[in-house]
């Protein structure tokens, strides 16, 4: 495939122009890009690779928030770096902690100056007995308008940069005390898994998501295995194969319906990439095997997609795909037109799929007491007055 043909496959959405801060953050740059930035400010070529590696270690292993913490870098070099760059990550505007331990953060992104509105996104930490999963956003808002999703009620503003995506992981480690230090030389390992299931469609922001996940999975940095990173897409078919080839993470498909006419309603992207095309892309996904199964997410909507006939059709659709099915009880949010399926019906659906040979875990609802529907915390805080938002921000800054 020619470069021009490949680029033609990349989906585009109308976006607000991103204006970087006056002093850009080094978070989210590759090693080669770090070397280039160091060259821009006069670091001699023989030193660039070594200095870039020092920065990489301090940013992604130690979690340094300021150049002054980088004690094996000379004072002169630290001063020069601080003059031109930062290692800023997003700012915590609000934090909600659920009774079940789930944490949700509303994060303000660095803006390009007084003339640009500071945008906000969410990320969520879900602790479990055997893992800790961080749900990360890829866009400010979303363009897909999925009928059951709260983020779909918010217009797409812009894509996140690689640094803003990596920054969410770093903020979570900051808040959880999950970096390496003298007391915890191997880290606490509270964040073991990453899921790209927050605000936005990751495959409509492919380049930034790819660059961010390559940093997050780098063994000499944050070091989360690619087998513990899952990218969820609503079905941007042209970029599914690229995900396997260029990122190599686990794939999840927001399926939610087994017939095109219903999926057209629930996931409007289906009108562009119908089920036949989507499932063929899954069959062709690089590296898919019984050891690296594709997850199909299926939100359980009462009287809409939860019949045993739907379960039978689901099994037929997935024939030949190394798959597991993640059944998701619908998480209600104000203004939604749907209800969660009855628990007995969810269990019957799960049992049928399991007996057909597919793993069919039912996702345990988490954090319902802290505005857990994706996008809901952002929507609720936008209704607050400036004084109330400042109070939330002050509370979030208090550990």
From Swiss-Prot:
Residues holding S-adenosyl-L-methionine: 200-201, 232, 254-256, 331
Subcellular location: Cytoplasm
Cystine crosslinks: 135-374
Main localization, broad class: cytoplasm
Cofactors that this protein relies on: [4Fe-4S] cluster
Domain Radical SAM core: 128-371
GO MF term set: 4 iron, 4 sulfur cluster binding; metal ion binding; rRNA (adenine(2503)-C2-)-methyltransferase activity; rRNA binding; tRNA (adenine(37)-C2)-methyltransferase activity; tRNA binding
Catalytic activity: adenosine(2503) in 23S rRNA + 2 reduced [2Fe-2S]-[ferredoxin] + 2 S-adenosyl-L-methionine = 2-methyladenosine(2503) in 23S rRNA + 5'-deoxyadenosine + L-methionine + 2 oxidized [2Fe-2S]-[ferredoxin] + S-adenosyl-L-homocysteine; adenosine(37) in tRNA + 2 reduced [2Fe-2S]-[ferredoxin] + 2 S-adenosyl-L-methionine = 2-methyladenosine(37) in tRNA + 5'-deoxyadenosine + L-methionine + 2 oxidized [2Fe-2S]-[ferredoxin] + S-adenosyl-L-homocysteine
This protein's record includes keyword 4Fe-4S: yes
Active site: 122 (proton acceptor), 374 (s-methylcysteine intermediate)
Gene Ontology cellular-component annotations: cytoplasm
Alphabetical list of InterPro entries matching this protein: Aldolase_TIM, Elp3/MiaA/NifB-like_rSAM, Methyltransferase_A, RlmN_N, RNA_MTrfase_RlmN, rRNA_lsu_MTrfase_RlmN/Cfr, rSAM
Enzyme Commission (EC) number: 2.1.1.192
UniProtKB keywords: 4Fe-4S, Cytoplasm, Disulfide bond, Iron, Iron-sulfur, Metal-binding, Methyltransferase, rRNA processing, S-adenosyl-L-methionine, Transferase, tRNA processing
A Pfam family this chain is assigned to: RlmN_N
BP GO annotations: rRNA base methylation; tRNA methylation
Cofactor binding, note field: Binds 1 [4Fe-4S] cluster. The cluster is coordinated with 3 cysteines and an exchangeable S-adenosyl-L-methionine.
Family classification: Belongs to the radical SAM superfamily. RlmN family.
Leftover remarks: Reaction proceeds by a ping-pong mechanism involving intermediate methylation of a conserved cysteine residue.
Function text: Specifically methylates position 2 of adenine 2503 in 23S rRNA and position 2 of adenine 37 in tRNAs. m2A2503 modification seems to play a crucial role in the proofreading step occurring at the peptidyl transferase center and thus would serve to optimize ribosomal fidelity.
Identification of the protein by name: Dual-specificity RNA methyltransferase RlmN
Source organism (scientific name): Rhodopseudomonas palustris (strain ATCC BAA-98 / CGA009)
Gene label: rlmN
């Amino acid at each position: 495939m020619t470069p021009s043909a490949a680029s033609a496959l990349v989906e585009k959405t109308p976006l607000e122009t991103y204006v970087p801060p006056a002093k850009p953050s080094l978070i989210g740059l590759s090693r080669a890009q770090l070397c280039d930035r160091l060259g821009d400010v006069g670091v001699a070529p023989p030193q660039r690779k070594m200095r870039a590696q020092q920065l990489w270690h301090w940013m992604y292993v130690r979690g340094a928030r300021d150049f002054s913490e980088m004690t094996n870098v000379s004072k002169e070099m630290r001063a020069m770096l601080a003059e031109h760059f930062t290692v800023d990550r997003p700012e915590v505007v609000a934090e909600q902690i659920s009774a079940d331990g789930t944490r949700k953060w509303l994060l303000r992104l660095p803006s390009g100056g007084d003339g640009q509105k500071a945008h906000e996104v969410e990320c969520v930490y879900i602790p479990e007995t055997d893992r800790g999963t961080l749900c990360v956003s890829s866009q400010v808002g979303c363009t897909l308008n999925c009928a059951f999703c709260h983020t779909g009620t918010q217009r797409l503003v812009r894509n996140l940069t690689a640094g803003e995506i990596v920054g969410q992981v770093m903020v979570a480690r900051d808040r959880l005390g999950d970096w390496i230090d003298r007391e915890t030389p191997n880290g606490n390992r509270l964040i073991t898994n990453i899921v790209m299931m927050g605000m936005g469609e990751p495959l409509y922001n492919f380049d930034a998501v790819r660059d961010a996940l390559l940093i997050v999975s780098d063994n000499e940095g944050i070091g989360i295995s690619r087998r513990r990173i899952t990218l969820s897409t609503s079905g941007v078919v042209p970029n599914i194969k690229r995900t396997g080839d260029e990122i190599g993470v686990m794939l999840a498909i927001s399926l939610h319906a087994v017939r095109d006419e219903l999926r057209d309603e629930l996931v409007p992207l289906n009108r562009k990439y119908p089920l036949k095309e989507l499932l063929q892309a899954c069959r062709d996904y690089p590296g898919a095997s019984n050891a690296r199964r594709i997850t199909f997410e299926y939100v359980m909507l009462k009287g809409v997609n939860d019949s045993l006939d739907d379960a039978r059709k689901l099994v037929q659709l997935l024939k030949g795909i190394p798959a597991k099915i993640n059944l998701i009880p619908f998480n209600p949010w104000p203004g939604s037109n749907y209800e969660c399926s009855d628990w007995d019906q969810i269990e019957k659906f799960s049992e049928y799929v399991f007996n057909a040979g597919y793993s069919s875990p039912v996702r345990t609802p988490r954090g319902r007491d802290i505005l857990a529907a994706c996008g809901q915390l952002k929507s609720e805080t936008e209704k607050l007055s400036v004084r109330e938002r400042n109070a939330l921000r002050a509370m979030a800054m208090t550990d």
